[in-house]
Amino acid sequence: MNDLITKHPMDGVRFTKPVRATDDIKFLTRDEQRVFLKTAKRSRNYNQYALILETGLRTGEMIGLTWDAIDFQNRTLTVNKTLEYRHKQHFWRAGPPKTQQSYRTIPLTDRAYEILKGIWDSRPEQKESPTLAKTLEYIDRRTGVSSRLVMRDLVFINWRTGEPAKN
């Protein structure tokens, strides 16, 4: 033998994502959720925690939530965008969800409806201002089309109080 490899040993091998075993998926039981929310009641972020537990939203989906995605009449919430922080570039980026399966319409439970309706009813009248007129622009990764997200449509949460930011 001359110790030469004539063919790459990985030729013909397909790389696939590892399949996650169902017992590897971590979730809170109903009792754990109840204890968590009882403890979180004192938190400024209680509404966010409760909404995530009620709807199954990911964090980026929740902070990218806009009022036009909420249908109070039909009691649904549509996930069609996310908001994520780009640490290296030091800015927030609004964009589409990461996968096609992430686009979805979620029926609101009575509790989720109460949370969102409470936030909607407690917000001050929107006033036009230069700040509210600013837009976030992003490029849709799938289509390459430049899109615009209007700031006044975003629901920003004041992390100190846990309530919607007042503009």
Identify the role of each PLM range.
Residues 5-65, 72-73, 84, 101-103, ...:
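Basic, Lys/Arg- and aromatic-enriched nucleic-acid-binding interface segment
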Residues 25, 69, 95-98, 145-146:
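Short secondary-structure boundary/capping segments
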Residues 46-49, 73, 79, 87-89, ...:
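Extended hydrophobic-aromatic, low-complexity segments
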